[in-house]
Amino acid sequence: MNSLFMIFSLGIVGASLMVISTPNPVYSVFWLVIAFVNAAVMFISLGLDYIGLIFIIVYVGAIAILFLFVIMLIQQPNKIDSQDHSHFLPIGLSVIFLFYSLLTNSPKYISNPVIGSRTNIGAIGSHLYTTYYELVLIASLVLLVAMIGAILLAKQPNSPFLYNSHGESLRSRQDLFLQISREHL
């Protein structure tokens, strides 16, 4: 168990170093996803199933993909960073030393029987769907309304509906008047 923890911890550190050292932002997001997946697998191997799955859903499925969409929408040309960042090395080494000293001086085993008995994802799911089922339904309705609102906000105001009353697609038809009037301009 300790060796798995060390392997995934080193994977997180290596992927995090690649995030900040890769010049291409798309590859940087890729390494960020790998760091998040390593953290999720580390949590799952420690018996914290719920936190590991939340890491995958929230961080990999939402935040990293949002970063990727923003990077692809901005479409900045590749810039080569010619600045020397070696003056940050002493600060980075001192932060690493501080974290290492805090970790080595912390108590090795911290146990809480209440937390230890509720780490199973099945217990959390059964508690959500039996005791708090009304809140789950309300949350799903709020998310549905938010999704419909996002679709309506993203729709352009002057664009026609996708289909007419006969079920034919309106986007595949061409506007003959616009084509004729463009030829004479």
Curated annotation (Swiss-Prot):
Principal location class: mitochondrion
InterPro entries: NADH_UbQ/plastoQ_OxRdtase_su6 (IPR001457), Nuo/plastoQ_OxRdtase_6_NuoJ (IPR042106)
Catalytic activity: a ubiquinone + NADH + 5 H(+)(in) = a ubiquinol + NAD(+) + 4 H(+)(out)
Any single Gene Ontology cellular-component annotation: mitochondrial membrane
One Pfam family matching this protein: Oxidored_q3
Recorded topology in the membrane: Multi-pass membrane protein
Keyword field: Electron transport, Membrane, Mitochondrion, NAD, Respiratory chain, Translocase, Transmembrane, Transmembrane helix, Transport, Ubiquinone
Function: Core subunit of the mitochondrial membrane respiratory chain NADH dehydrogenase (Complex I) that is believed to belong to the minimal assembly required for catalysis. Complex I functions in the transfer of electrons from NADH to the respiratory chain. The immediate electron acceptor for the enzyme is believed to be ubiquinone.
Family designation: Belongs to the complex I subunit 6 family.
Name by which UniProt lists this protein: NADH-ubiquinone oxidoreductase chain 6
Name of the encoding gene: ND6
